[in-house]
């Protein structure tokens, strides 16, 4: 996959609106998608899917990128670069990606992947409640099930 700067900038705008300005993700995405009418369905899908995925895995990605809220502009780029590296996407030679430590990101991901609250990207309080009420073994299964993407189901009424 090749990254295009205008699409990455759109994702960064969505992340800024959602993380820093506390706006709803769907409203922010809707607003950003109106910026450029030339974007096709694939471009729009990339912006929406990437934004939602980064928002979903915020805790893991911010821990790997060592970013703290409120996020500065360069920290949002770091979070995006963590997403791209973990997806196996080669980062372009843009100034925003010059200091990206690929190996350290992958190493930190491997380390954090062993800790449930980071692996599943959930808050500490939720992890504590789930583990105490369901037990560690059942909570692990429940969390992994919750993080699987739902299959598409279509119903046809005749």
Spans of model-derived segments:
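Class I Rossmann-like S-adenosyl-L-methionine
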Residues: 1-156
